[in-house]
Amino acid sequence: MLRLIALLVCVVYVYGDDVPYSSNQGKCGGHDYEKDGLCCASCHPGFYASRLCGPGSNTVCSPCEDGTFTASTNHAPACVSCRGPCTGHLSESQPCDRTHDRVCNCSTGNYCLLKGQNGCRICAPQTKCPAGYGVSGHTRAGDTLCEKCPPHTYSDSLSPTERCGTSFNYISVGFNLYPVNETSCTTTAGHNEVIKTKEFTVTLNYTDCDPVFHTEYYATSGKEGAGGFFTGTDIYQNTTKVCTLNVEIQCSEGDDIHTLQKTNGGSTMPHSETITVVGSCLSDVNVDIMYSDTNHPGEVDDFVEYHWGTRLRFFPLPKRCTPVS
């Protein structure tokens, strides 16, 4: 208790060590204020003048109570009440304390309809661009501007933030397998989407994919096999659909089912994949899938990778194989 009293005494007199002095033609130095021809000490931010100065006594300053503040040097008779809590579409960006008013701004997904002296007073939800349209910018107030997605781009969701994404006209599905025993090096042209050996069958099924698969490829080197399925480049993916690939590797022996997990890659284009291995002929499988816009090489690619097993060193596809019609 004595410690608290000592602190309050210090607060009261820290601004009042010197008695007031006479003003110079109504002017005072620093932050001092003039009263009845005397220059008196002002209170620091976070305090108010609980008693103004007089002959022989300087200003008495007291701290602001909770919910009130003073932001600058002053000799005000009371602290200012803080703004009320931020509600609705408003979120607090500056809490109320002894030296600051509460500041409210729009929460994510909203924009300011009415600005106040300190923050925003009224917020409203931003416009959401429908599927087939993307965000092109914002109004001066911060509302969303939408534009129809140009050719070879897409937006498939109702969103106040999503811009039109790029599409693709080429898909390559490459895989590496271990161990394999049968020696092979073949290229197959035609709408087959199946690679078959004595040990396993690799089948590619797909739905809602516009680029057309027309080439299959498989080769071996030692105990490792590599192959793939490839499309042409003359058709772009319809951006209102999601290209879905299902790659199944069916061993000639066993019936265990393993679903490969994605280990690398993101998605900025409309596609999804499922990769499964059925049977017990393989210990390691790696599947790489690339979606590309060949008219913008290196700029517009989605690359995803799926892996199962522990062996990570795989050999690349041979540059040449004997075509098989």
Swiss-Prot record:
S-S bridge residues: C28-C39, C40-C53, C43-C61, C64-C79, C82-C96, C86-C104, C106-C120, C123-C146, C129-C149, C164-C185
Molecular-function annotations in GO: tumor necrosis factor binding; tumor necrosis factor receptor activity
The protein's name in its UniProt record: Tumor necrosis factor soluble receptor
Residues that carry a glycan: N105, N181, N205, N238
Described purpose of this protein according to its UniProt entry: Binds to TNF-alpha and beta. Probably prevents TNF to reach cellular target and thereby deampening the potential antiviral effects of the cytokine.
Organism the protein comes from: Rabbit fibroma virus (strain Kasza)
Keyword Hydrolase: no
Per-repeat ranges for TNFR-Cys: 27-62, 63-104, 105-147, 148-186
Domain of life (superkingdom): Viruses
UniProtKB keywords: Disulfide bond, Glycoprotein, Receptor, Repeat, Signal
Signal peptide: 1-16
